[in-house]
Structure formats: structure tokens, C-alpha cells
Amino acid sequence: MTPPSLSLTASAPSSSASSDVLVLGARSDDEGVIVLSAGARDGLAAELAAVGFSGGKDELVRLPGAEGGPALAVVGMPDERDEDAFRYAAGTAVRQLAGVQRVALALPTETDAQLGATLEGAALGAYAFTEYREKTKAGVKEPVAEIQVVGRSDEGDALIARAATVAEAAGLVKDLVNAPPLDLYPATFAERVEALAADLPVSVEVWDETRLAADGFGGILGVGQGSARPPRLVKVVYSPDSATRHLALVGKGITFDSGGLSLKPASGMVGMKYDMTGAAAVLAAALAAAKLRLPVRVTAWLCLAENMPSGSAIRPNDVLRIRGGRTVEVLNTDAEGRLVLADGLVAAGEERPDAIVDVATLTGAAEVALGTRYAAVMGSDDLVADVIAAAKASGELLWPMPLAGELRATIASDVADIANANPGNTAGGMLLAGVFLQEFIGRSGDAEDSPRIPWAHLDIAGPAKGPSAPYGFTGKGPSAVSVRALIRLAEDFSGR
């Protein structure tokens, strides 16, 4: 989709010639409505009270504007003035004002951080996906095309550039996830990556099925061998000369997950095009780092396969040899994400980056435990703390989970180094997946007792699917969860 134009303006527009709607912020308490934005017209608080405005999150009230001026909209804001309050309020307003061409936001910003969050939230709220609509396209309101934010900053250009880049990254994830698996499969995904990278200072390397076999990527090959559309591994590298640290990102990219021979029920297959969200997120984060010219090396590994049943599909009890030689007995072909990630994690570790973060819609257990707003994170304590801090700063919800080493025996194999699942076990499925992945994290040096490379695993299965009802800047459909946190983490790694 085409992103909105963003700009800063020193004062709120007074004419409908420059803006169609002016958005203000307000809240309410026991004493009534409190308008937070400066310059509001006299009596506005009473008008809001008369129409039942409560100041809650996701609340937007539209009122007539002054004669000759833009219409007025008032969005609910909490009393807290953290960055996320501005991001959320701006996104709420812009999302709900779809169908309006030009919007100006005059929220009570006082700092560059609040101003940047307002720009970001507004841009995130201006998303729609209509590529596959024909007869019904006219019924979908166009997102806001022009966004002005009232505020001044010496860093205005940088704030606008960052907000636009973050919103473009989230939009890319949503576009990729929204695409049907008929059109987005491993080969076309790889082609899309090459096209996206063409004008950026990044390199792209693609492993087809022949090269995957030659280089020992048995997990990706095994998962993909049941499909008529063969798998791919895509490596995206942004490596500026100024970089002193290296962040590796590994994404699960199952373009459609039928479950393989361990077939899902029909209802369980609906939405399984979302199973490549992790790969889309790490791709978008790497491209964003390049657009922002961050002084940090970012390598994204996209592990792409389609998990389908056929006469050539892997079977329960088959043994796969992962890159590096470790063997895995497949006891559940629907626990395929960890198999492709294992290859990606080993490959990422061979370069000995400063940290590895993998992102995957990995387990239904994560959604059962944490619902559809929170993603899980587990791994090395210090890196997990860094990832959580990046998520908090970017307005994403992560919850730390333990790496339960005592569960390792649960996925022991009678014939291989490890099993990918324990079909009779119903407890701790999310934790078991993390314990499995930990087996494939490399060491930071040649010695066998060298410490393992810091690693964090994000299980985004719950929030990736998006809400059944929109909220904030997030509409129905894919949420682009984790991409903003990954961009912030790359910024933190760069020292910017």
C-alpha cells in the first residue's frame, strides 16, 4: 500500500483548505471532561460531556468545526504521558478517520519522544489492504493520505523519517502476511525480497533446493519436501562500514502450514498463511535498519517452506540431519517451524554475531498461555531483558517465559539426537519448543566450553493473527507484531 505523507506544522490549521479534520486529545475524571490539547475552543469540554465522551482508549468523537475550518475529532487519552499513550491515541484517531483525506493532530506533546510517537502511531493507523478486492473494493474506506502533526522540533526531519520507516516496515509485514499462499510461496517470497532490496545498501543470497541439499540444510528441505513448491533459505545482510556490532535475526517462514501428514483439521488450516509472519518481520526489520542507515550489522535469515502432505512428505519417525550434523527425529510433522528454525539458527551462529533473535508463530500453547496481545520471549537473560526493553519503548507487549531445562528429557529420541515433539505430552508446549531451539545455538568461540551466543526466542503465535476487532492503530488482520521491537533493538545495538 502507499504510505501516508507525514509533516510537522507549528500551529493547528484553522482552514479546511489545509486539513479536513483536526484531532485533539481529552480525558475525563470524576470532575468531568478535561481537554488536553492547547487552543481548544471555549465550551468544548461541555460539548464532549453532553455527547457522553468518557476519554477512554479507542474512543473518538467527531464534532463540527468552526465556520470555514476543519471538522473536529477528539480522541481519548490517559492521564499518563508516556510515548505509547501518544502512539496509541494518534493511531486510534487516524485508523477511525479512514475515508478522510487530510488529518491534523494537535495532541499535547511536550518532548521529541512524544512527537515521534505521535507521528509513528498516526502512520501505523493509515493502513488498508485491498489488493484482492474487486467488486467490494469501493466499500473499503481509503486510509488517511496526508497527516500533519502539530509540534516543533530541531529533529523534525529525523522524527518524520523514522516514523515513516517504522510504518513502512509494519505495512510490509502486513502486505506479505495478507497475500494468499497461492501467490506467496517460498520462491516468490525470495523474489519479493530481491526486489525490495534492490535500491537499498543490502545484499541478498538465496539457497534453492539444490543448494540447500548441498549445504546440509536438512530441516528446511525436510519440511518442504511434501510440497510441489520447493523451499528456500534467504539471507539478507545490511553491513555498513561503521558497524561494530552484529545482530542476527532468524524468521520462521512457513508460507502455508497444513500440518503435513500430521494433518490439521480443516478449521485449523484457516489462517495458516500467517505462519510466515516471523520471516516477514525479520526481513522488514533488516530493511528498516538499512533505510535508517543504522551503524550496526543486521543479518536476517528467512527460513521458507510450505508444509504439505503428499507421497513425498516427511513421515513421523523420519530422521532429519540439521545443518551442522545434529539429527532430529520427527514425531509430529505439524511441529515443523522448529525444524526450519534449527537450520537458520545454526547458520546464523556460524557467523558468531553478538546476538541472535528468532521470531516465529511457533506454538498454539503460546496463545493459550498469553492470549492474542502478548508475545512470549525466552532465552539468554541479558538479551531477553534488552528485547523486552526495546518492546516496551516501541509499544509492543512481550512477556518473559522460562527456558525449562528439565523438560529436555521430554523430547529425547530413541534413535536420533533429539525429537521435535512428544505427541503424548500436553504440558509446556511453548517451553518445549524453546528448549528444542536452544540445542542449535552456537558458541561464541572455537573452544567447546566457550559461552553460547546470546539468544532470544520470540513466540508470536498469539498476536500475529491480529484482533477480531480493531484497536489503537491495529486493524483487523495481521498485526506486524515484533517488527517495531526489532527495529528498536537494532537501534539500541547501534548505540543510536
UniProtKB/Swiss-Prot annotation:
Entry binding sites for Mn(2+) 2: 252, 257, 275, 336
GO biological process, one term: proteolysis
Chief place of localization: cytoplasm
Keyword Metal-binding: yes
A Pfam family reported for this protein in Swiss-Prot or TrEMBL: Peptidase_M17_N
Residues given in the record as Mn(2+) 1 binding sites: 257, 334, 336
Cofactor names: Mn(2+)
GO molecular function, one term: metalloaminopeptidase activity
Catalytic reaction list: Release of an N-terminal amino acid, Xaa-|-Yaa-, in which Xaa is preferably Leu, but may be other amino acids including Pro although not Arg or Lys, and Yaa may be Pro. Amino acid amides and methyl esters are also readily hydrolyzed, but rates on arylamides are exceedingly low; Release of an N-terminal amino acid, preferentially leucine, but not glutamic or aspartic acids
Alphabetically ordered keywords of this record: Aminopeptidase, Cytoplasm, Hydrolase, Manganese, Metal-binding, Protease
CDD domains: Peptidase_M17
EC numbers for this chain: 3.4.11.1, 3.4.11.10
Cell location: Cytoplasm
Cofactor note text: Binds 2 manganese ions per subunit.
Active site: 264, 338
InterPro entries in the cross-refs: Leucine_aapep/pepB, Macro_dom-like, Peptidase_M17_C, Peptidase_M17_leu_NH2_pept, Peptidase_M17_N
Role summary: Presumably involved in the processing and regular turnover of intracellular proteins. Catalyzes the removal of unsubstituted N-terminal amino acids from various peptides.
Entry's family note: Belongs to the peptidase M17 family.
Entry protein name: Probable cytosol aminopeptidase
Originating species: Leifsonia xyli subsp. xyli (strain CTCB07)
Gene: pepA
